[in-house]
Amino acid sequence: METKSGIGDEKLFVEDNSSIHMVKSLHQQFRSQLQIFIYYVKTRTPPVYCYPIATILSFLLISKTQILEDVPAAFGIGIASYLLGLATYVYNDLTDIDVDHINRKEQSIVTQNQSRRGLIIIVIFLFGLAATISYIISFSAFLISIIFIILGIFYSHPKFSLKSKFPLKTIVTATGAGLLSLLGGVAAIGNGSDYDTLHNTTIFPLSTIYLAFSFSIFYFIQSPMGDFADIKGDRIAGRNTFPLVLGINRTLAVMLSVPFIILTMNGMCYNLVHISIHGTVAIVITCLLVVGFIGWISNRLDDPLLIKSKRNNVRYLNILMQMALLIALL
C-alpha cells in the first residue's frame, strides 16, 4: 500500500511539474509576443501614424458638426486604421528579412530573433482586431478593411510580391493609403452621418474621393524617397524601383509632378465640390513647401541616412495637405 501510494505521489509530482513547466512556457511566449509588439509600436508608429490621422480627417469631412456625437466611432475607426497599417508593416518585415539585413541591420536582428510563427500570430491578431472594429462601426468600413488586408498580403507575400514589381510597389502603396483615407468617410456614412447628395456619387461623396486621392498620390513622393534610401539593398535584391528603373532625374520629376497634379485638381474641382478660397490658399502654400522640400533633398541624394531621416518630413507635408484640403472642402 505504501508503495502504491508512493507511486501515486510521484505521478502527481510529475504532473504538477509538467503543469508548472507549461505555464512558464506560455508565460515566456506571451512575454516574447508582447516584446515584439511593443518594438513594432515604437519603431513603426512614425510611418503609420499618418494613416489614422487621414482616416479621422476623412471622417470629420463627412460628420462635420456631428463629430461630437460621433467621437466613439471616429476614435474606433482611427484605431482600426492604425492596426491595419501596423500589421502590414509587420508582415512586410517578416517577408523582407534578407533585404532589411542590408538596409536596416538593427531591424533585421530583432525580426530574426523572433519565430516566424510568433510574428504571424501578431499579424493575424492585428488584422483580425482591425476588421472586427470596422465591422462594428459599419459593414462598408469592414469591406474596405478586408480589401486593404488582401492588398497588404499580395504586396508582401513571396508568391505575389507586388513590392518587387515596378511600378506596382508604389501604386499598391498609394492605393492602400487611399483606402485608409476613404475608410474614415465610409465609416462616418455608415455611422449615420448625413451628407449633401449634390455632385456626389451614389456611394461616396466626391469630396471624400478627392481627399483620398490627394492623400494617396503623396506616396509618389514618399515611396521614391524610401527607394533612394534603400537603393543599395534593392539593387542587390534585384528589385525594380523608381531610381533603379527611371534614373534619378526622372524620379525627381515624378515627385515634383505630385504638387502640380493637386493644384490642377483644385482648379478642376473648385466649383464641383465647392472649394473655399481660404482652402485654396492653404493648398497653394503647402504645394510650394513640397516643391521646396524636393528641391532641397535633390541635392543630398548621396546621403541615404539623411534621406531616411527626412522621410517623416514628407508625412508632415502630407498631413498638412490633408488639413488644407479639409479647410477647402468643409
For the regions a protein language model found, what residue spans apply to each?
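Multi-pass alpha-helical membrane architecture of UbiA-family
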Residues: 2-330
